[in-house]
């Protein structure tokens, strides 16, 4: 088919489509060419036109595009939450106030709270929207669980209402996409028995491929809650909670948490502390899953397990994780 039937210009054999559209500054001849070589095109990089890009510049451009996409996804998740008035609506806060009473209605303080729930919810909602809310002092007691003594700090039931709204409407939707599937603590639809079944599936997967070869590495983070650095929590709030009012509220919960060491530690028994600490090691979890490529791996609060067919490689991986 000739150039006349396609209504092409008379010099179509000596011009490429890029030069035809004016993308390259000079025509490139393709006549009698067995292989068309790739020629540099114009790129817009940091507000300047480039004909040639080095390898470092291409890597940087790809990184900036990936970074922009990640930031856009974070912004979309924050926009999906809505404004403060929607997140802490009267209907939602009243619903979470009712949930705070489940199982503890025999307490006098809970009965007083539920009896004044209509007016109390409106009062606390106004304080949250005006950024005047401050949590009350927690009740401290010790609990012996399977032979281990744990210090518990129970918040007042009026604060629990706000904690539940903050966790379910803000922290869980924003922290969830950053966590791996095999992180099963304090999440809806998961839990201890779910993790038992997940571990059983992973053991079956390993045995079908490697038999009895390999080993299991168990890790325990000592002083997980008492040693939680507040700086990392504030940094994660800055990265994921893009609404300044919501970020200030989440920072207030951390700042007023009872901890013996300034700038370090979160209390057991406070629901936002559970959500913060469940998502805190997400960077390590994603590194083990994605970078190290460990399929049989799980994380339940401060307990880790890794199943690997090569014992020596598993030891080396354990040192890298630590």
Features from the language model and the residues they span:
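Conserved pre-motif C helix in the palm subdomain of viral-like polymerases
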Residues: 149-180, 262-290
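Right-hand nucleic-acid polymerase module
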Residues: 36, 41-63, 67, 155, ...
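Glycine-/proline-rich flexible loop or hinge segments
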Residues: 99-111, 143-153, 180-182
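Reverse-transcriptase-like RNA-dependent polymerase core
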Residues: 124-148, 245-258
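Active-site-proximal segment of RNA-dependent polymerases
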Residues: 24, 32, 80-84, 167-219, ...
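Non-catalytic, polymerase-adjacent accessory regions of viral genome-replication enzymes
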Residues: 2-122
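Short coil/turn segments at secondary-structure boundaries
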Residues: 109-113, 136-142, 177-183, 211-218, ...
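Conserved polymerase palm-domain catalytic core
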Residues: 202-301, 305-321
């Amino acid at each position: 088919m000739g150039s006349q039937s396609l209504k092409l210009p008379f010099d179509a054999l000596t011009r490429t489509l890029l030069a035809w559209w004016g993308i390259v500054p000079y025509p490139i001849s393709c006549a009698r060419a067995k292989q068309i070589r790739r020629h540099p095109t114009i790129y817009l990089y940091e507000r300047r036109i480039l004909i040639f890009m080095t390898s470092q510049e291409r890597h940087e451009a790809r990184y900036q595009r990936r970074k922009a996409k990640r930031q856009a996804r974070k912004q979309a998740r924050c926009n999906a939450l809505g404004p403060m008035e929607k997140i802490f609506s009267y209907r939602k806060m009243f619903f979470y106030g009712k949930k705070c009473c489940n199982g503890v209605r025999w307490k006098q303080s809970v009965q007083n709270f539920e009896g004044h729930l209509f007016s109390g919810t409106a009062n606390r909602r106004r304080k949250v929207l005006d950024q005047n809310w401050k949590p009350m002092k927690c009740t401290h007691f010790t609990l012996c669980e399977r032979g281990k003594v744990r210090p518990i700090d129970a918040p007042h039931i009026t604060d629990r209402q706000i904690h539940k709204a903050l966790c379910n409407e803000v922290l869980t939707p924003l922290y969830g996409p950053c966590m791996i599937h095999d992180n099963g603590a304090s999440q809806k639809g998961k839990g201890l028995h779910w993790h038992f079944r997940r571990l059983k599936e992973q053991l079956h997967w390993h045995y079908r491929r490697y038999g009895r070869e390999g080993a299991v590495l168990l890790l325990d983070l000592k002083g997980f809650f008492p040693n939680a650095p507040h700086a990392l929590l504030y940094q994660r709030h800055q990265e994921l909670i893009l609404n300044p009012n919501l970020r200030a509220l989440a920072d207030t919960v951390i700042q007023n948490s009872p901890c013996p060491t300034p700038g370090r530690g979160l209390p057991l028994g406070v629901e936002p502390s559970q959500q913060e600490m469940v998502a805190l090691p997400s960077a390590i979890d994603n590194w083990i899953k994605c970078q190290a490529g460990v399929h049989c791996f799980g994380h339940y609060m401060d307990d880790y397990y890794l199943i690997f067919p090569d014992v020596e490689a598993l030891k080396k991986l354990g040192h890298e994780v630590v």
